[in-house]
Structure formats: structure tokens, C-alpha cells
Amino acid sequence: MMRQSLQAVLPKISGNKTSLLRKSVCSDLLTLFNSPHSALPSLLVSGMPEWQVHNPSDKHLQSWYCRQLRSALLFHEPRIAALQVNLKEAYCHTLAISLEIMLYHDDEPLTFDLVWDNGGWRSATLENVS
């Protein structure tokens, strides 16, 4: 039996609209992470308070954290077509993650880095998103 595949033809988006889309997604993700009533699991948004009760060097915990975060973000952000979550730093008082994002209607990957800092998440890359 021959398998047929359907390909959706997506309209092209101009560079300016792509830049606005990227900034909007990053801004919305940062808001989601810093929301006191976020729909994300507490370990994913609470950062350090929850992270300190675990062994941050535990590779199984790191893998679980990345899988859970990826699943939650894909559920809550419909503009993301593909996502890879990496821990850049995972120490007792430092938690830094990198999100490698592919958006629908965008051919270039988007890297969004987040760091837990003084009780909240901040991004060093939001200003550089284009």
C-alpha cells in the first residue's frame, strides 16, 4: 500500500512580521514563566525554591525537567512547531535553560535563554530577538 502525504501550503510571512512573531513568542514565554499563577508545573516556574530540594547534578532529574518543560510549553504555546530544552547551568543557586524553538511560518530556529535570578526568570536574549 502506498502512503500519501499531505503538505499544507503555508503563506510566506515578511521579515518584519517574522521578527514581531519571534519577539511576541519570547515575551509571552517570559510572562508565562514569571506568572504567579502559571499553568506550568511548580518546579518549572518556581526555579530555585523547588530546585534546591533536589540534587541538581542528577542527570535523571535534569532529563525529566527538560521533558516536562518541553511538554508543558508545547501545550501552552501553539505557535511553536518544534522545541528542544537544554539545561545550560544547574547548580544549587543557579538555573539556566536554553530553548531552541522552531515556529510555524518561520524557517530559522529561535534560541531563547532564561536564567533564574533573584526570585524570577529573566532573559538575556529577549532584546536580541529578531
Curated annotation (Swiss-Prot):
Keyword Cell membrane assigned: no
InterPro entries xref list: Anti-adapt_IraD, IraD/Gp25-like
One GO-annotated biological process of the protein: cellular response to oxidative stress
Localization, UniProt: Cytoplasm
Coiled coil spans: none
UniProt KW Cytoplasm keyword: yes
GO CC terms, sorted: cytoplasm
SS bond list: none
A Gene Ontology molecular function term of the record: anti-sigma factor antagonist activity
Keywords: Cytoplasm, Stress response
Function, in words: Inhibits RpoS proteolysis by regulating RssB activity, thereby increasing the stability of the sigma stress factor RpoS during oxidative stress. Its effect on RpoS stability is due to its interaction with RssB, which probably blocks the interaction of RssB with RpoS, and the consequent delivery of the RssB-RpoS complex to the ClpXP protein degradation pathway.
Subunit structure: Interacts with RssB.
Family: Belongs to the GpW/Gp25 family. IraD subfamily.
UniProt name for this protein: Anti-adapter protein IraD
Species whose genome carries this gene: Escherichia coli O7:K1 (strain IAI39 / ExPEC)
